[in-house]
Amino acid sequence: MLTPLQTYFPIAVALLVAVGLAAVMLALANVLGPRRPSEVKSTPFECGSLPVSPARERFSVKFYVVALLFIVFDIEAIFLYPWAVLLLPSDGYPGLGWAGYISMGIFVATLVAGLVYVWKKGVLDWAD
């Protein structure tokens, strides 16, 4: 019988092989790779055309707010999928029933209320 530590031995070996292989590849690329810096190589790449603005430029805070809202609603989708799968009974599983339905309704209502609040505050208004 294997001890709990022995059951994780193959995972540890796979992890060590992956880290070792990555380290060897990085070391070989660093040792064998050519070093010929030039002005063209140091310019930022902009879809094959010449850059029209500096690479280090401040972004508007609105981009970050939209990114945070995307993450919130993406996490909502992550929670909705397993809920939808487990809501109805199937294959001997009793299902979530009304308690699961009501709890997800409260969750979605909270997120919709947050979206309405954000909308009313004008966070999603890009006119200004």
UniProtKB/Swiss-Prot annotation:
Q: Name one GO cellular component term.
A: NADH dehydrogenase complex
Q: Where in the cell is it found?
A: Cell inner membrane
User: Highest taxon of the source?
Assistant: Bacteria
Q: Name one GO molecular function term.
A: quinone binding
Q: Which residues form a coiled coil?
A: none
Looking up Pfam families in the UniProt record yields: Oxidored_q4
Enzyme class, UniProt record, top EC level: translocase
This protein's membrane topology, according to the annotation, is:
Multi-pass membrane protein
Q: Which reactions appear under catalytic activity for this entry? A: a quinone + NADH + 5 H(+)(in) = a quinol + NAD(+) + 4 H(+)(out)
Family in the record: Belongs to the complex I subunit 3 family.
HAMAP family according to UniProt: NDH1_NuoA
* Known partners and oligomeric status: NDH-1 is composed of 14 different subunits. Subunits NuoA, H, J, K, L, M, N constitute the membrane sector of the complex.
Name of the featured protein: NADH-quinone oxidoreductase subunit A
Question: Organism source for this protein?
Answer: Anaeromyxobacter sp. (strain Fw109-5)
